[in-house]
Amino acid sequence: MAGATLFERAQALSSVNREEQDSSLLNKLVRDQEGAENDEERIRIKEQGILQQGELYKQEGKAKELADLIKVTRPFLSSISKAKAAKLVRSLVDMFLDMDAGTGIEVQLCKDCIEWAKQEKRTFLRQSLEARLIALYFDTALYTEALALGAQLLRELKKLDDKNLLVEVQLLESKTYHALSNLPKARAALTSARTTANAIYCPPKVQGALDLQSGILHAADERDFKTAFSYFYEAFEGFDSVDSVKALTSLKYMLLCKIMLGQSDDVNQLVSGKLAITYSGRDIDAMKSVAEASHKRSLADFQAALKEYKKELAEDVIVQAHLGTLYDTMLEQNLCRIIEPYSRVQVAHVAESIQLPMPQVEKKLSQMILDKKFSGILDQGEGVLIVFEETPVDKTYERVLETIQSMGKVVDTLYQKAKKLS
C-alpha cells in the first residue's frame, strides 16, 4: 500500500543531509490523493506518518521544521473528521511546545493554529489550543494576556460544561495569580478547579498538578509547611505513577518543607527511600546541601550551596522565595548568638565574625531592633552596638487591674440579686 510505504520511509529517515527528502515526503504525506478519500486505513497510516515525522523533528530539535509541518498538514486535516484533526493538531503543537527551543515563534504559532480553527469552525479544537496558549503566556511571564484569555475561555467552557478543559484553565488561572502574588484569587481559582475536578475522573497527571499547586499555596500563603508537605507527597505519588518529570519537582518541594520545618535530619531519610532513589541528581543534591547548612546553622555553607547549585535553587521561584526566609532566620540566629555575651560590641567585629559586609550587618541589626528581637541601639558615630539587658516586666499593675475587674463583676452580681429581692 502506498500509505504504508510512506510511513516506512518516514521511520527510516536518517539524521543527516535529508532536507530535500523531508520536503518530498511531507508533500506526499499530506497531498497524496491516490485511493478513496474515505479509506480509513489509508488515513490512519497518513496520521501515523505525520506524527512520526513530528516526533523525529522533536528528537532532533528542529523547531522550525516542526512548525512548518503543523502548517503543511492543514489541507490534509480538512479532509478528515474534526475529532481526528483536533487530536493530530494538539499532538503536533504539544510536541513543538515540549521542545523548549526558545525560537520566539511559539506564541505566534499557537495564534495561527487558533485562527485556522476559527476559520474551520472547530470550536473544541480552538478552545483546547487557547488553553495551551494560556499555558504559554504563563511560561513566558505574559500574565496579563494569560488572565484576559483565561477569563474569556472560562465563560465559554462553563456554558459548554467541558469540565476537563475547565479544570486545566482554572488551574492555570491559579498559577498566574500566584505568580502575581495575588494569593486570595489564586486560592479561589484553585478551589474552583478542585470543585470541578471532584465531579469528573481526573487523570493522575491532572490530580498531581492540583495537589502540587495546593502545596505551593499552603506554603506561600499560610506558611503551613506541614500541610504543604502532605500535598507535595500526594503530587509526587501521582506524577511518579505516570513517570512525569514533575515528580522530581514535587520531591524537591517535599524536601524544602522539611527544611523549613526545621526537620533537616529527615531529608536524608526521604531521599534514601525506594521511590526517591530514581530521582537522584543535582536537584536532590542541592536540597541536601541546604539541609546540611540549615542543620549546622552555617551561613557560609548555605551561601556555598546557593552558589554551587544556582540553577536548581536561585532559578526556581518557589524554592528561592522560601530559602530567602530561611536565610533571614539563620542570619538572625547567628547574630543573636554572636552578640549574646556582650553589652557593647563593635559592629565591625560582628561583621567579621559572621563574614558579611558591614553595611549589610548594620541594616539587619537595625531591623532586628525595630522588630524587638533584642533591646539595644546602634551608635553609628562610634560604630558600636549597645545591647540592653532584658528587664523583667512588672506585672503588679496587670494583676491589680484583673482584681478590680473581678470585684466589679461580683458587685454587679450582688446588685442584681438585691434588686430582685426588693
Swiss-Prot record:
The lineage of its organism: Eukaryota, Metazoa, Ecdysozoa, Arthropoda, Hexapoda. Belongs to the proteasome subunit S9 family. GO terms for cellular component: cytosol; nucleoplasm; proteasome complex; proteasome regulatory particle; proteasome regulatory particle, lid subcomplex. Disruption phenotype: Embryos develop and hatch normally but fail to outlive early larval stages. During the first and second instar larval stages larvae become immobile and sluggish and die without any observable defects. Lethality is probably the result of additive defects in overall cell proliferation rather than of distinct developmental disorders. Component of the lid subcomplex of the 26S proteasome, a multiprotein complex involved in the ATP-dependent degradation of ubiquitinated proteins. In the complex, RPN6 is required for proteasome assembly. May act as linker between 19S regulatory subunit and the 20S proteasome core. One of its GO terms (biological process) is proteasome-mediated ubiquitin-dependent protein catabolic process. Component of the lid subcomplex of the 19S proteasome regulatory particle complex (also named PA700 complex). The 26S proteasome consists of a 20S proteasome core and two 19S regulatory subunits. Interacts with alien/CSN2. Interacts with Prosalpha2 and Rpt6. This is 26S proteasome non-ATPase regulatory subunit 11. Pfam families: PCI (PF01399), RPN6_C_helix (PF18503), RPN6_N (PF18055). Keywords: Phosphoprotein, Proteasome. It comes from Drosophila melanogaster. The modification Phosphoserine is found at S24. The gene is Rpn6.
